[in-house]
Amino acid sequence: MVSSDRPVSLEDEVSHSMKEMIGGCCVCSDERGWAENPLVYCDGHGCSVAVHQACYGIVQVPTGPWFCRKCESQERAARVRCELCPHKDGALKRTDNGGWAHVVCALYIPEVQFANVSTMEPIVLQSVPHDRYNKTCYICDEQGRESKAATGACMTCNKHGCRQAFHVTCAQFAGLLCEEEGNGADNVQYCGYCKYHFSKLKKSKRGSNRSYDQSLSDSSSHSQDKHHEKEKKKYKEKDKHKQKHKKQPEPSPALVPSLTVTTEKTYTSTSNNSISGSLKRLEDTTARFTNANFQEVSAHTSSGKDVSETRGSEGKGKKSSAHSSGQRGRKPGGGRNPGTTVSAASPFPQGSFSGTPGSVKSSSGSSVQSPQDFLSFTDSDLRNDSYSHSQQSSATKDVHKGESGSQEGGVNSFSTLIGLPSTSAVTSQPKSFENSPGDLGNSSLPTAGYKRAQTSGIEEETVKEKKRKGNKQSKHGPGRPKGNKNQENVSHLSVSSASPTSSVASAAGSITSSSLQKSPTLLRNGSLQSLSVGSSPVGSEISMQYRHDGACPTTTFSELLNAIHNGIYNSNDVAVSFPNVVSGSGSSTPVSSSHLPQQSSGHLQQVGALSPSAVSSAAPAVATTQANTLSGSSLSQAPSHMYGNRSNSSMAALIAQSENNQTDQDLGDNSRNLVGRGSSPRGSLSPRSPVSSLQIRYDQPGNSSLENLPPVAASIEQLLERQWSEGQQFLLEQGTPSDILGMLKSLHQLQVENRRLEEQIKNLTAKKERLQLLNAQLSVPFPTITANPSPSHQIHTFSAQTAPTTDSLNSSKSPHIGNSFLPDNSLPVLNQDLTSSGQSTSSSSALSTPPPAGQSPAQQGSGVSGVQQVNGVTVGALASGMQPVTSTIPAVSAVGGIIGALPGNQLAINGIVGALNGVMQTPVTMSQNPTPLTHTTVPPNATHPMPATLTNSASGLGLLSDQQRQILIHQQQFQQLLNSQQLTPEQHQAFLYQLMQHHHQQHHQPELQQLQIPGPTQIPINNLLAGTQAPPLHTATTNPFLTIHGDNASQKVARLSDKTGPVAQEKS
């Protein structure tokens, strides 16, 4: 039940390939916890339950105290007992019949089920056959607990034909439970064996690939146990061999296992299957790498004596990878590069890395590190290995021989793959043999542990190396590397990156891995320049120092180019692009990416990247990798937590957008980079060399600081995409098993899908919140004022039919809009809307007598300049005619009088007089004519559409109530009056006032009182007439009835909007 991320310690694996279920989690017995699957302890008094979140079905681990179900129930301990076994302690959960049962009992008895698989409760016992309850536990019998032997239900030995039965918890305490891989990839079979068959099975399992493991992830990684054991033996043998050649202390045994562990972890994170296969190959092909990897070299500055030792060891060690580690181990403190500092010997000797990439021991000093430390390989260590390796390779022609080839290429590539974040400065001066402080000091501290999946890549590389050995020898005659001897140009790489993560790690590693393999001659002209990447603790500064014994340090890129022409590959710029990382080794890629910058990824130096140069030894080759001086910032950095802290995450990061992008530069096109640099055709010589894939080109002098380096990728995603695509092609070229590619692809797809789902969840969550908010708003009841429910819908329909000049009645959705005169420009509303709003509105809402004008601040509506209510009659005047505005008076329950239409420009009725029952409004549309209201009076002969339509649709009148019919009749009379005689503005208003007052008194006095609206008589006629004396809004000749004094009108509008604002907001 433990998450598949679980790391497996080597010691555990070696001691027992099948995990016995003892100690730790009450369910799975594992004592470790992970961030994604923590081990949770019950805080109940006297309770010792400890369970993994996944093992106990804890949906979310609380931040405070956590209690198991038993403690949570507060039931007396005496009453809580498992129905499947005699034991009372442990992780219990409720059963469907109200009892209790252990989670582990439920897992191992096949017929028991969980009602809810995610919470793992309740435990369903109804399907358990009665026969299980009749069995007796042979373990209880053996231990003298005969009384309890028949208690509960027993499981049986998983061995076919064996009839032994025992309680699950008894078997757990005896260590007889295990998990086997089921038929499907994701299936786990929980089973147990009697002691006899378990011990027998255990012996057979040690030699077999099939792994019995506690967890799925472990099961896959366990398949490699036998390999690890063999490797361990090999390591020991090699270590002995090393001792002969070297005075270095033998690596402590603890170191070896921990290293191995690392490897395993890495594998598990990447792809267990492919890895195990590759491990086999590695063992077969390159046992030589292994001991070097494990050996810890104490870093003592080497005097000339050490150097000589180194040479001797190289000569002897050609055939055994061990020698490489020895070289690295000693850093010549003296010698020509006295300045170089060596911190610990790099754990990986050049070739050594291949055996177990994980095994890199980055610890500075000889101390053994815990598996976690190993997990975090320090990039510098790896890098160092690759460098020293390169030194050796150049120094010894023999290196090319099978071993050396594997060492050089494999080790370098691997070590580089691992790129270590090294905390301490690593100075690797692979001088040609002479001073070669071959040991790159991996002074790098163990640095944060990266769990990387690099191993598979390493294995692949070792295989590749074998393939290439022949090529290398032919291409780079073994003699060439020797040529380098003379020159001390050993590059002295001092990479001190204060931030472990930032240090150059993966880029160089991956690059070198492939490139080094190919070119033992990396140092070929001795030209390795010593890049000293001294990254200050900040890691921002990476200074490259080129030391060429023969050649003067080249500071300019042109010189580098020349050197390249001479045949030296500039391992260009791996650092940033890391495409090589991928290319270096398929699986290693993830690792390198994880290293990738975490804080100052800028440090990545592409040290190992020097690819074998095809150059003649004579040329003073400057071409060494230019340390990519990118500071963390220029290099697209991924926060450290993003990559590398978890094994899976490193893979994922690597994979990250891989698939879609075309590789900018195909690996296949190895020569591409080199050629671009003007390298001689020979430069492209190792077609596979990942160096070619390096994408970053530094046009600036290598020493230049970050600003000179062109940013390679705008974002880490682009960088990773490039890496991925190039690595993919590289793997294809190498004939790497497709399963690695397939797994990487599937991981990438899963990651993309996961991101998509996360986005979807975010969007849905936001949508849900919006809907909840809207629901809350809508749940507030609308205050409905229904004084005179009248068949308003009929009237609205009628009005819609009768207003020929209007498109449709616009009614605002709020039922109270009747109160407001505010224009609603946007919503043409269906008649149904009108009816519904009209019915729910009080017929008098629009007609209510307004409070005194002075009480509210002036406010002007956009479409209606002024609105004046006179004892419930609303008069609207259009203030501005700049653009056609449809101002709608919200539907009210009864049809009011409509005053006048201006004949000339088909203006819809400008003013609306609402009878007390309500206002039937027609939109007041302004023509484009800026002063549409300039017509002072309505000519007597003007035809008024409204009265005509009213008479034409007289059939509709029958449907109206008496009250409404009266209103319409008054309307017609009023229109006729206007037609027959010219009225002065005062007469108009007086007439209108009387009409309204009459209706108001007759019908709506009770209504108004109910609504607590001031009486109709509060507004004296003088106030009404005052508007005519004030200057009109438009022209002096404007009809005062149509244009009411601006102040009065705006104040009314303000009041109306104040009343209806909240309602409108609620509705919207």
Curated annotation (Swiss-Prot):
Residues 750-778 are annotated as: Leucine-zipper. Residues 291-305, 387-396, 404-446, 595-604, 660-673, 800-814 have a biased composition (Polar residues). It is found in: Nucleus. Expressed abundantly in testis. Changing residue 109 to A: Impairs interaction with histone H3. The keyword Nucleus applies. A zinc finger (C2HC pre-PHD-type) spans 79-112. Its main location: nucleus. Residues 465-483 have a biased composition (Basic residues). The record marks 627 as: KMT2A/MLL1 fusion point (in acute myeloid leukemia patient C). Residues 223-240, 306-317 have a biased composition (Basic and acidic residues). Keywords: Chromosomal rearrangement, DNA-binding, Isopeptide bond, Metal-binding, Nucleus, Phosphoprotein, Proto-oncogene, Repeat, Transcription, Transcription regulation, Ubl conjugation, Zinc, Zinc-finger. One of its GO terms (biological process) is positive regulation of transcription by RNA polymerase II. Residues 206-260, 291-505, 583-612, 660-708, 800-865 are annotated as: Disordered. Changing residue 22 to A: Does not affect interaction with histone H3. Residues 80-287 are annotated as: Self-association. Changing residue 120 to A: Impairs interaction with histone H3. The modification Phosphoserine is found at residues 217, 252, 436, 532, 684, 686, 689. Residues 311-674 are annotated as: DNA-binding. Residues 141-233 are annotated as: Interaction with FSTL3. The record marks 664 as: KMT2A/MLL1 fusion point (in acute myeloid leukemia patient A). It is linked to A chromosomal aberration involving MLLT10 is associated with acute leukemias. Translocation t(10;11)(p12;q23) with KMT2A/MLL1. The result is a rogue activator protein. Self-associates. Interacts with FSTL3 isoform 2; the interaction enhances MLLT10 in vitro transcriptional activity and self-association. Interacts with YEATS4. Interacts with SS18. Interacts with DOT1L; this interaction also occurs with the KMT2A/MLL1 fusion protein. Interacts with histone H3; interaction is necessary for MLLT10 binding to nucleosomes; interaction is inhibited by histone H3 'Lys-27' methylations (H3K27me1, H3K27me2 and H3K27me3) amd acetylation; interaction stabilizes association of MLLT10 at chromatin; interaction is essential for histone H3 'Lys-79' dimethylation (H3K79me2). This is Protein AF-10. The gene is MLLT10.
